[in-house]
Amino acid sequence: MFAVNYIKNSCCANHAICTKKENLIIENTEITNYLNSISYSDTLPFIPPIDFGKVIKVYDGDTITIAAKLPNTLGPIYRFSVRLLGIDSPEIKGSTFKEKELAIISRNILSQHIMGKIVYLRNVSMEKYGRILADVYLGDLHVNDWMIKNGYAIPYDGGTKHRPSAWDNDSV
């Protein structure tokens, strides 16, 4: 649909012949023809070139949302979901009451430190769920390490998660 609208609005605006549906289909085919031979293995993941942004949401102790523009653009401000690299925190939708309780504590502590502030991203990549994966800094403070050192998260290498037994304890 984008290609058709682009042709109609940009390429053909002053040409009566382009207003016919068959001409739009021909133009659309020419624009998208290169896609016919593309497969998944021919493509690369898109890693947004984001270096910093304002924290607008803290989902849990290892996932935040930032607002940022793409560099060198006047364009819109986008929101990006960012997973803190190298850490795992209790899950808000965890399997035990204790894990959910710890997740709220972890989220609230992280939120108190970074919500509404400008953070810087380093070692940016994409993770399997489509989120940005990055080291997050607030000034000189490496937020990821701070969460681990203060007991609100555990180290995580991206493989199998190893939940501490304390997350499974339902006693309060």
Q: Where do the protein language model's features map onto the residues?
A:
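Small beta-barrel nucleic-acid-binding modules, primarily SNase/OB-fold domains
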Residues: 1-172
